């Protein structure tokens, strides 16, 4: 997790993002104690993060490394001394939230470029993905740094059942291999005591296959440090059925008859980019229920 780290939060408060009032930023609204104070990627943490990556690659060994998935990377309305200085160097208005969010997007793109170059200098064949819980037009400029796309979307965990149908129909037009990502949990990440019912998990995975995506079912290691047999029995049962369908789902391209322009492209710069507009949700529902094959596009797509 790139921008959440409990140890960093405790030991290096000078690396944390702060809002316009000088308060640490907690985007999750979780009561203390927690580890959700967001880290600023403009701070000394960036070198610490690169040192961690280098140590990990050296310990694992390049020959054993498939790829690196970096989680929790998103725009933050940060007004720390590092961001203020960089904005001033670019002639940007540090008192404007719109300008701060515009700079946050620029800085995040620049961070991804630097980290991808750093990783590939040591592990040229490693796959790379930066997860911000959503794949949409706002992140499009940085997708050149991704080897593939992973669409995190837990229907019962905050994303809802409308998120994946819309996002996948946009992401499949970006020229990257695409994987759908759900979880084995009944609700959200970290819901350790629960298992999603098999029918729901099958629906999610079969939906991934139907839109041309691979399947990923996420888990987290229980604090006891032992994998849950029940979880992997569940996942195994679902993947057994997925395996039977895989020969028909490789190297596929959707044959669509309708294109819908996403309003995300035109959101205000200070708007949250992971929230789908009601108009898009309604359009996707109607077209799905009528049985049409369609894509979600932006204005730059052919």
Q: Could you say what each language-model-derived stretch is?
A:
Residues 41-145:
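Active-site neighborhood of glycoside hydrolase catalytic domains
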Residues 2-60, 98-101, 112-113, 300:
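Active-site-adjacent "subsite" loops/lids of carbohydrate-active enzymes
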Residues 1-2, 258:
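Contiguous N-terminal and early-domain "leader" segments and peripheral loops that mark the onset or edge
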Residues 97-137, 142-302:
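Carbohydrate-binding surfaces of carbohydrate-active enzymes
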